[in-house]
Amino acid sequence: MAKETGTAKPARQKKEPQPLVIPKNATDEQRLKLERLMRNPDKPATVPERPKEWSPRSAPEFVRDVMGSSAGAGSGEFHVYRHLRRREYQRQEFLDGMSEKQRLDEEYKKKLIQNKMLEEERTAKRRLKRQKLKEKKKMCKKGKKEEKKEDKDGHTDPENSAESSDKSDLEDQ
């Protein structure tokens, strides 16, 4: 048996048993992650890097031996040709995909701008309508106040009526 040494190891702190919590939705999952991070705020949180977009190997700038698709019997050159051809097709497919993606992005941006312009036009039209209604209500209130004023006086002043007609003419313009 092994000999016991006089130095004893310090007792390890036991972690509190955590109940198993299964997140039911995204907010629960986010809350659990935040709670775990906040248990030890001194520990730095790791933010994963965004994965790099895949791109094919670049084509060689200079190819010394250009071989054809036909090869003699027992020749290993055909395999080299086949790999080069596959890589070139892959590169062309990637470039086609990138151009398609750019085209779709441009169309999307144009559509966003067009929708924004249409929305602004509709908003301006509705704003004008609201302003007209406001002015109409003000005119109705003014007209009622003037009628009440005339009723209280019992008679109409030719000077006041001329002034009110001048004001209404100015407002119509």
Curated annotation (Swiss-Prot):
Record-stated family: Belongs to the PRKRIP1 family.
The protein's name: PRKR-interacting protein 1 homolog
Coiled coil: 99-150
Disulphide-bonded residues: none
MF term (GO), any: double-stranded RNA binding
Subunit and partners: Component of the pre-catalytic and post-catalytic spliceosome complexes.
Region annotated Required for RNA-binding, chain positions: 50-142
Gene Ontology CC terms: nucleolus; spliceosomal complex
A biological process from GO: RNA splicing
Compositional bias segments (type: Basic and acidic residues): 26-42, 144-173
UniProt-annotated location(s): Nucleus; Nucleus, Nucleolus
Region (Required for nuclear localization) location: 125-137
Region (Disordered): 1-59, 117-173
Cross-referenced Pfam families: DUF1168
Role description: Required for pre-mRNA splicing as component of the spliceosome. Binds double-stranded RNA.
Domain of life: Eukaryota
InterPro entries (UniProt xref): Prkrip1
Keywords: Coiled coil, mRNA processing, mRNA splicing, Nucleus, Spliceosome
Encoding gene (name): prkrip1
Compositionally biased region (Basic residues): 124-143
